[in-house]
From Swiss-Prot:
Family membership: Belongs to the bacterial ribosomal protein bL17 family.
Quaternary structure and partners: Part of the 50S ribosomal subunit. Contacts protein L32.
Any one GO cellular component localisation term in the record: cytosolic large ribosomal subunit
Superkingdom field: Bacteria
NCBIfam families to which the protein is assigned, alphabetical: L17
Keyword vocabulary terms for this entry: Ribonucleoprotein, Ribosomal protein
Protein name: Large ribosomal subunit protein bL17
GO biological process, alphabetically ordered: translation
Amino acid sequence: MRHRKSGRHLSRTSAHRKAMFQNMAVSLFEHELIKTTLPKAKELRRVAEPLITLAKEDSVANRRLAFDRTRSKAIVGKLFNDLGKRYATRNGGYLRILKCGFRAGDNAPMAYVELVDRPVGGSVEAAE
């Protein structure tokens, strides 16, 4: 029975899923806009938003938790120094998912995942 089991498998092992979402979260925090498939985008929200919530309170313990989940010192620095302060007054909803059509090869639904209130200087072409 699958009672209370949430989340998508995405045809991957649990280790592959964990590594994939860790890499996607790091890319999202680095570029603030990424393009991926719609199911991956919806699952990424469950990984990335708690990290931003964690970054709103700067402590050594929270930094260690964030490093454990991202494995990137640069991203931990950006989370706590930039993103945590940017979203200090926002109670959740840090990501925006925008549908952007279908992929040419396999017709998979695609989506942009971006951080809300990000600087406007970034371009959509950089996400591709």
